[in-house]
Amino acid sequence: MSRLLCPSSSTSVVRRARPTFVLGNLSIKQAQGTGASSALARRRRSTFAATADGLHVIPLEQKYPFPWLRDACRCPDCVHPSTRQKLFCTSDIPVDIQPATNGVEEVGEGVKIRWSNGHESLYDWDFLKEHSSSVSRSEANKDLPRVGWTRASIAKERDLYLEYEELKTKEGLRKAIDHTCRFGLLFIRNVPNVETSTASCSLRTLAHYFGDIRTTFYGELWDVKNVSNSRNIAYTNLGLGLHMDLLYFQHPPQFQFLHCLRNRVQGGSSIFSDALHAAETLRIQDAASYSVLTDVQVPFFYVNDGHHLYHTHPTIEVSASGDVNQINYSPPFQAPLLLDTPPAFFTALHQFSNLVNSDENTYEYTLEEGDAVLFDNRRVLHARRAFEEIPGQGVRVGEANRWLKGCYIEGDTMWDRGRMLR
């Protein structure tokens, strides 16, 4: 595919003497001397200021470097009108690109820049505001802020439990996705549980409301029930501590569904803990320990049943800006630590473990037949209490008395669906 370059891409910058501070077609000094236009100059001076290092937008308290602005031009020569795809490379832009002399002008919609080679770009106020900070970018993308929770606070959320029928409407589905994005935990009641086959079960329909199912070596959908000679502790009746799934993958699944088909046992309640809340609490209580958990790589592995998977992750994964992106905590699948693991790591992990396992931070619920739970596998830890089968509970021959069916959901597809619904 040929690459169409914007006019400035192949034209060198013509350096000319120009005022240090330009507003429209007048420098400040020139504008102040015009008398009748002094009020206009004052108004413009409070909105935009062009200096040698970029465009300053006064109300937003933000500076936009000229190379960034040239790269962000959205005119038809720079961005294809129908595909909305960029028609040039960032590397095509001269690193020292500047506007032409007196080439910055405030217009009704925002600010127009005439570059040194004659190309013109228009940046409206909404665009500049959208890109002024990470918060404003998230708002423009219709992303929702994550809200940390404790046992007491999550119990008060009115959308923690929703009805399956609600998801068949756009408003109901939006409400479900919004709640999951904010809190990472959602229960759905009265999901049909008569059909149990993987091909036509209701979990498949339920999952597709939210996004695309992610296939792993467990398949598209999988069953969680007590089986003999299990190769995974989840397929026993033993208690299972707080953990996340598939951390031995480079990119573990973002969301997980569990649908309760049968529950005629004693015990077996599900436990959830917001590891994001625990991480933020640790950051406040002990910044040094928090830092250790963001730095030290922890290995996870699965070597069983014809598979050999291994990957390392920090316990707390942060973004370039320092925000917590996701958590990686799964003691059952943790491999031997690296030999250079510092002693401080053990203290830090002990503190983190105490936080996620504390009674005040764990939410417990026994799934009833027809209940489904959706949770963020990169944020919310899940566990299960041990259970005992009760004879004579009326299940069909060969069926387990406790039977969950599960699947994973790709995060991007659910976030995409949520943005469109908003």
Curated annotation (Swiss-Prot):
<keyword id="KW-0560">Oxidoreductase</keyword>
<dbReference type="GO" id="GO:0045329">
    <property type="term" value="P:carnitine biosynthetic process"/>
</dbReference>
<feature type="binding site">
    <location>
        <position position="245"/>
    </location>
    <ligand>
        <name>Fe cation</name>
    </ligand>
</feature>
<feature type="binding site">
    <location>
        <position position="119"/>
    </location>
    <ligand>
        <name>Zn(2+)</name>
    </ligand>
</feature>
<feature type="binding site">
    <location>
        <position position="73"/>
    </location>
    <ligand>
        <name>Zn(2+)</name>
    </ligand>
</feature>
<dbReference type="GO" id="GO:0005739">
    <property type="term" value="C:mitochondrion"/>
</dbReference>
<dbReference type="Pfam" id="PF02668">
    <property type="entry name" value="TauD"/>
</dbReference>
<dbReference type="InterPro" id="IPR050411">
    <property type="entry name" value="AlphaKG_dependent_hydroxylases"/>
</dbReference>
<feature type="binding site">
    <location>
        <position position="78"/>
    </location>
    <ligand>
        <name>Zn(2+)</name>
    </ligand>
</feature>
<protein>
    <recommendedName>
        <fullName>Dioxygenase str8</fullName>
        <ecNumber>1.14.-.-</ecNumber>
    </recommendedName>
</protein>
<keyword id="KW-0408">Iron</keyword>
<comment type="pathway">
    <text>Mycotoxin biosynthesis.</text>
</comment>
<dbReference type="InterPro" id="IPR038492">
    <property type="entry name" value="GBBH-like_N_sf"/>
</dbReference>
<comment type="similarity">
    <text>Belongs to the gamma-BBH/TMLD family.</text>
</comment>
<keyword id="KW-0223">Dioxygenase</keyword>
<dbReference type="InterPro" id="IPR003819">
    <property type="entry name" value="TauD/TfdA-like"/>
</dbReference>
<feature type="binding site">
    <location>
        <position position="75"/>
    </location>
    <ligand>
        <name>Zn(2+)</name>
    </ligand>
</feature>
<dbReference type="Pfam" id="PF06155">
    <property type="entry name" value="GBBH-like_N"/>
</dbReference>
<dbReference type="GO" id="GO:0046872">
    <property type="term" value="F:metal ion binding"/>
</dbReference>
<dbReference type="InterPro" id="IPR010376">
    <property type="entry name" value="GBBH-like_N"/>
</dbReference>
<feature type="binding site">
    <location>
        <position position="382"/>
    </location>
    <ligand>
        <name>Fe cation</name>
    </ligand>
</feature>
<dbReference type="GO" id="GO:0016706">
    <property type="term" value="F:2-oxoglutarate-dependent dioxygenase activity"/>
</dbReference>
<keyword id="KW-0862">Zinc</keyword>
<dbReference type="InterPro" id="IPR042098">
    <property type="entry name" value="TauD-like_sf"/>
</dbReference>
<feature type="binding site">
    <location>
        <position position="243"/>
    </location>
    <ligand>
        <name>Fe cation</name>
    </ligand>
</feature>
<keyword id="KW-0479">Metal-binding</keyword>
<comment type="function">
    <text>Dioxygenase; part of the gene cluster that mediates the biosynthesis of strobilurin A, an antifungal polyketide that contains a key beta-methoxyacrylate toxophore that targets the complex III of the mitochondrial electron transport chain. Strobilurin biosynthesis begins with construction of benzoyl CoA by step-wise elimination of ammonia from phenylalanine by the phenylalanine ammonia-lyase str11, oxygenation by str8 and retro-Claisen reaction to form benzoic acid, which is activated to its CoA thiolester benzoyl CoA by the dedicated CoA ligase str10.</text>
</comment>
